[in-house]
């Protein structure tokens, strides 16, 4: 089993990478001395596949296991579902000597993590991500929270897990669209942080699309290592960590405007990345060849690139409700060529939209 550590002093934690080793979860949790009672938060789809092996592993390690099943989908990442989780935690009698396991994708991880951060002023939690997007992004770094009708992730907290267990074999049961969505977040790291990793993805598209285990394990581990290096330097998004929002400013606007129902998160990010690449070129940060490479990779990964047809005013309203807006200015992430980035404050959002063909 391969391991990397997210180094955050007393909040440091390991990320374990493996293939077909969910049975190890119980012993890994026992090593962390998290307490004896655990609530596993999952959804019906993931639970049908993986709750039993997770439960058996935890029980065999001496834990008392409770199951919390919540609806599947981004539209349920809200205060109503969060209240249901609190109700179950209270009904089960979980105390500060208990912990939560988030078994699922990004929605489950975000909500279960936020419940852990706030229940009894904080109990430990463990991430067991079952989607590619969650494995390479949301399970690492401690961002937890829920959506508000006015925007995505407007309510939340930074709260680090005690460990993350990533088993790439669980991706075999992931729907194709969900899997491709995760490849968008993976590509993001290459575009703004690591040109060599971008080339690795570009050269191994077919292996990635076929879910080749060796290739996947290497790509997921590299993605997590890149994210961990950013989080270690800027845990609470005071500066550097904003690079991880590449493609997300426009992507979140797309999700908000479509009610979180038309696009998966990674699909919206892919649209945002395509537009960010065009904007970066227009602003002089990258070349047309760089933009062509980004758009080509997204195309090879079968990801959307075109903005849905909303008015400039609708896009501006959605973008200006984003948490990346500070003091009236929008902090926007531009790719500098491939493998590097710059962050600049944009006062005129309509200028960005015009570059994207909105409001010409």
UniProtKB/Swiss-Prot annotation:
GO biological process: amino acid biosynthetic process; aromatic amino acid family biosynthetic process; chorismate biosynthetic process
Enzyme Commission number(s) from the entry: 4.2.3.4
Chief place of localization: cytoplasm
Annotated keywords: Amino-acid biosynthesis, Aromatic amino acid biosynthesis, Cobalt, Cytoplasm, Lyase, Metal-binding, NAD, Nucleotide-binding, Zinc
Sequence similarity: Belongs to the sugar phosphate cyclases superfamily. Dehydroquinate synthase family.
Function, in words: Catalyzes the conversion of 3-deoxy-D-arabino-heptulosonate 7-phosphate (DAHP) to dehydroquinate (DHQ).
Name this polypeptide is given: 3-dehydroquinate synthase
